[in-house]
């Protein structure tokens, strides 16, 4: 089964920047894109195939057609026709709302299959870029309620200056916000459940404020502080370097200036590549070839056992790789 590209869903947001527009070389005058949903099976937001025999098919339709060949036997048994991950580029000119996501158990009570554990990999920053991940100290539900009422909750959050290459793991229940000036790749469980705690009193084009979910957020939040919210990893050129490993996904960083081989024989899962620098010719174990350039994402079927990555031109090729462990 051949590698698959999808048409990204471009989302205009009140906080969106221009980094996605530039990376994807969108036409001049295109409204700022805050989010690009690269690969999605979220109902109502399914990405569609851009070429080949399955041109125009949605991701859920592909799973129905190919089953375990596409997603892996264990994934098909566990998730059925529901694709378990959602892949995005995010560009923020203004801070996103302070928010939290539910875990699987809470999401199930809402009738949804997944909570939302996610991670961020920073691929670009502007002056003063920072983000919020977690509380600066142990907090409590009562203090949270008071902090929301009097507006002091921001004083209790852990803020982090960001740089290209930074990685943050955001488990369900952790309060967080992407700050202005960040351009990042987000890998998350396939869920659109977000509980907004505070949205900086912003209004949309019609003058309306976005809905807050203060009580649901209180139920979802983990109020215990961590000592270090950054994810530390060691990256080397020409290798698939581990960044995040959790029950929901494994994510590795691939950067190379020459042809490299990646072995997937032991992985019973689809593999997603999200390219953010350069261009490469990819050749799978069956000899299928495809070009992948910065701003594009690719789904490798679980039936594929290996991949050759050959950078094109004189630039380095860099991508984030993720799959289900």
Each language-model region and where it sits:
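Short beta-strand segments in beta-sandwich/barrel cores
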Residues: 260-262, 278-283, 297
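Double-stranded beta-helix
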Residues: 132-155, 185-227, 313-325
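C-terminal amphipathic alpha-helical segment
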Residues: 195-267
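His/acidic/aromatic-lined binding-pocket segments of jelly-roll/cupin-type domains
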Residues: 87-88, 96, 118-121, 159-160, ...
């Amino acid at each position: 089964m051949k590698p698959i590209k999808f048409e990204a869903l471009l989302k205009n947001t009140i906080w969106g920047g221009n980094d996605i527009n530039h990376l994807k070389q969108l036409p001049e005058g295109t409204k700022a894109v805050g989010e690009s949903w690269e690969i999605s099976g979220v109902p109502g937001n399914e990405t569609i195939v851009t070429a080949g025999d399955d041109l125009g098919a949605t991701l859920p339709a592909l799973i129905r057609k190919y089953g375990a060949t596409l997603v892996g036997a264990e994934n098909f048994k566990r998730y059925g026709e529901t694709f378990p991950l959602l892949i995005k580029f995010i560009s923020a000119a203004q801070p996103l709302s302070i928010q939290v996501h539910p875990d699987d158990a809470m999401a199930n009570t809402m009738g949804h299959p997944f909570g939302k554990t996610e991670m961020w990999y920073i691929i670009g920053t502007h002056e003063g870029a920072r983000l919020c991940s977690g509380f600066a100290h142990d907090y409590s539900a009562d203090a949270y309620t008071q902090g929301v009422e009097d507006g002091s909750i921001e004083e209790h959050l852990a803020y982090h200056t960001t740089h290209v290459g930074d990685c943050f793991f955001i488990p369900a229940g952790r309060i967080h916000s992407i700050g202005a000036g960040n351009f990042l790749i987000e890998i998350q469980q396939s869920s659109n459940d977000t509980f907004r705690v505070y949205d900086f009193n912003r209004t949309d084009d019609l003058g309306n404020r976005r809905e807050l979910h203060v009580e649901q957020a209180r139920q979802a939040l983990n109020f215990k502080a961590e000592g270090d919210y950054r994810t530390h990893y060691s990256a080397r050129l020409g290798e698939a370097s581990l960044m995040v490993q959790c029950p929901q996904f494994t994510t590795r960083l691939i950067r190379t200036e020459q042809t490299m081989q990646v072995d997937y024989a032991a992985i019973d899962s689809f593999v997603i590549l999200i390219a953010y620098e350069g261009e490469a010719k990819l050749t799978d174990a069956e000899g299928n070839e495809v070009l992948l350039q910065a701003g594009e994402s690719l789904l490798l079927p679980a039936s594929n056992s290996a991949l050759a990555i050959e950078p094109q031109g004189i630039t380095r090729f860099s991508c984030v790789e993720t799959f289900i462990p």
